[in-house]
């Protein structure tokens, strides 16, 4: 177990909503800010501390318009009933937004600019489309190809560069669903999912506490029958080996080690290191490799020291390419043990804190000590966080 210093950044708790389908899904009548506020209230209820001590609520969100606009972070805090003296901000690093929220809060704690932070992220992709209101500068084409904005084509590029076959991708996708459904049936998500009121297909109110995107019947034959969607003539990436459009939120409670101790709260993990890195936009999915390498170096670790990994699965071709790049291709038995975004979906701003929360729970379930959460980011970035149980 890790020995803590007073200003070490500890994770006290982490929760998430179930993941809903973006098209006519269970959260179709639930707003992004309301969904997030439910998690903040649950996080507070699960942990005894004075909410007046919260320095800031930091929320990741990508498409900050419509119901996700006007600093959704501040709105979430007010909706959740936090004192008006608690500040709120919204951060955007595209797919890595809520992991960036972790990093932002951690940096403030480490430099003595606050002791308690609530962080999280949300994306309601059913209400706010991925490209809603986007107006990219035509001059940007000098620096990256327009096709680099099409995430599926970047996955095709990575797959070809790293020799990832269609069969490998299909197998990876089916396994993601199998693991996620097994985790659901065995109750491995119960400690992280907070049930939120939504609606079933008939419009009746239900408590949504099971991920809606998982396909229990996923099988190799069905996956093999699908045609490539991004490069119809020579491609290998299909809808089944891409992360689903989904709606969801996540939240975490971070503190300084000394404040958690003073409050009698037992930390679940300490943040060992953090990193971000850039790469070519055409292979944006490779970003976790340089980001992880930086984070490992800062922690004085090697990839061999990592016992549990949560890697965002934007696409099977992307995930497998990253595993090859990190030397984890033959260690998939320690990666995404409860399934990944191919099965659970990838609500952009939600995903960073979601995979970190899932990582924490898997580490406890597997009784491992050191874990890595990492993800790719559109336009060529990666982000990584190394945590250790305490």
From Swiss-Prot:
Matching entries from SUPFAM superfamilies are given as: Thiolase-like
Identify the catalytic residues. 95 (acyl-thioester intermediate), 346 (proton acceptor), 376 (proton acceptor)
Q: Which InterPro entries match?
A: FadA (IPR012805), Thiolase (IPR002155), Thiolase-like (IPR016039), Thiolase-like_sf_Thiolase (IPR050215), Thiolase_acyl_enz_int_AS (IPR020615), Thiolase_AS (IPR020610), Thiolase_C (IPR020617), Thiolase_CS (IPR020613)
Chief subcellular location equals: cytoplasm
| Biological process, per Gene Ontology | fatty acid beta-oxidation; phenylacetate catabolic process
The job of this chain, per UniProt, is described as: Catalyzes the final step of fatty acid oxidation in which acetyl-CoA is released and the CoA ester of a fatty acid two carbons shorter is formed.
Stated name of the protein = 3-ketoacyl-CoA thiolase
Per the UniProt record, the source organism is: Acinetobacter baumannii (strain ATCC 17978 / DSM 105126 / CIP 53.77 / LMG 1025 / NCDC KC755 / 5377)
Q: What is the lineage of its organism?
A: Bacteria, Pseudomonadati, Pseudomonadota, Gammaproteobacteria, Moraxellales
């Amino acid at each position: 177990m890790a020995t803590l210093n007073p200003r070490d950044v500890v994770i006290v708790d982490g929760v998430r909503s179930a993941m809903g389908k973006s098209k006519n899904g269970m959260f179709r009548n639930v707003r992004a800010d309301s969904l997030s506020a439910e998690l903040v209230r649950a996080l507070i209820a699960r942990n005894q501390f004075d909410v007046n001590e919260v320095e800031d609520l930091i929320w990741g969100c990508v498409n900050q318009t419509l119901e996700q606009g006007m600093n959704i972070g501040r709105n979430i805090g007010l909706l959740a009933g936090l004192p008006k003296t608690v500040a709120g901000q919204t951060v955007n690093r595209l797919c890595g937004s809520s992991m960036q929220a972790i990093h932002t809060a951690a940096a403030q704690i480490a430099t003595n600019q606050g002791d308690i932070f609530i962080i999280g992220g949300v994306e309601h992709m059913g209400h706010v489309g991925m490209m809603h209101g986007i107006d990219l500068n035509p001059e940007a084409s000098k620096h990256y190809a327009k096709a680099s904005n099409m995430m599926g084509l970047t996955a095709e590029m990575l797959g070809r560069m790293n020799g990832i076959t269609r069969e490998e991708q299909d197998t990876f996708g089916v396994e993601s669903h199998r693991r996620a459904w097994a985790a659901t049936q065995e109750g491995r998500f119960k400690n992280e999912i907070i049930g939120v009121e939504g609606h079933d297909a008939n419009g009746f109110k239900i408590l949504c506490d099971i991920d809606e995107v998982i396909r229990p019947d996923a099988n190799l034959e069905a996956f093999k029958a699908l045609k490539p969607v991004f490069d119809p003539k020579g491609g290998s990436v299909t809808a089944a080996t891409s992360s689903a459009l989904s709606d969801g939120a996540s939240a975490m409670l971070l503190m300084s080690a000394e404040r958690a101790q003073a409050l009698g709260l037992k930390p679940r993990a300490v943040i060992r290191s953090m990193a971000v890195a850039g790469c070519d936009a055409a292979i944006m999915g490779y970003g976790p490799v340089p980001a992880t390498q930086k984070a490992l170096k800062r922690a004085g670790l090697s990839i061999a020291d990592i016992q549990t990994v949560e890697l965002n699965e934007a696409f099977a071709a992307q995930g497998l390419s990253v595993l090859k790049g990190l030397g984890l291709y033959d260690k998939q038995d320690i990666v995404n043990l409860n399934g990944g975004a191919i099965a659970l979906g990838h609500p952009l701003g939600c995903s960073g804190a979601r995979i970190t929360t899932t990582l924490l729970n898997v580490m406890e379930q597997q009784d491992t000590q050191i874990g890595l959460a990492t993800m790719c980011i559109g336009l060529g970035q990666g982000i990584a966080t190394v945590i250790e149980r305490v």
